[in-house]
UniProtKB/Swiss-Prot annotation:
This is Crossover junction endodeoxyribonuclease RuvC. Pfam families: RuvC. It comes from Teredinibacter turnerae (strain ATCC 39867 / T7901). Keywords: Cytoplasm, DNA damage, DNA recombination, DNA repair, DNA-binding, Endonuclease, Hydrolase, Magnesium, Metal-binding, Nuclease. The lineage of its organism: Bacteria, Pseudomonadati, Pseudomonadota, Gammaproteobacteria, Cellvibrionales. The keyword Transferase does not apply. SUPFAM superfamilies: Ribonuclease H-like (SSF53098). Its EC number is 3.1.21.10. It catalyses: Endonucleolytic cleavage at a junction such as a reciprocal single-stranded crossover between two homologous DNA duplexes (Holliday junction). The gene is ruvC.
Amino acid sequence: MPLILGVDPGSRKMGYGIINATGSRLGYVASGVVRIPQPLLVADCLAERLKVIFDSLSEIIEQYQPQEFAIENVFMAKSAGSALKLGQARGAAIVAAVNKDLPVSEYEARKVKQAVVGTGAADKLQVQHMVCTLLKLSKAPAEDAADALAVAICHANSQQNLIRMAGARRYRRGRTV
């Protein structure tokens, strides 16, 4: 499987993580956090924040040339306004991916945690720890970057399961079904 760009969306900061998934092997490529400049946060200039997200992800896609894009779905917000801003930030990220002809996959936070930690109720530290373990990292990435790497790992595992299921044969009472 090719390079996968995972994204943990946010309207103030957004984590990204890139992994190489070959068969069942996962390899770390890069990760980081796109931070919105303080003046844009103070001015509460959402349109400019969305531009920063779009431009930053476009540059990351251009630099690393991933073949697949996975992003976490919005699962909760402090208020309706926060949910709308987060949804718009996700939209900017998705448009950056689609603009570069990347297929987009979306995953619920619980599914990401389940895929990486083994339980959908995992906390951030458990996710960070398992990301380090699965990718053989000596140092834990920032929380948002670890979450983005977890999204990429979830996508890689989901794709591997689909490949396995497509090639699998079921046996019942000694005969192929």
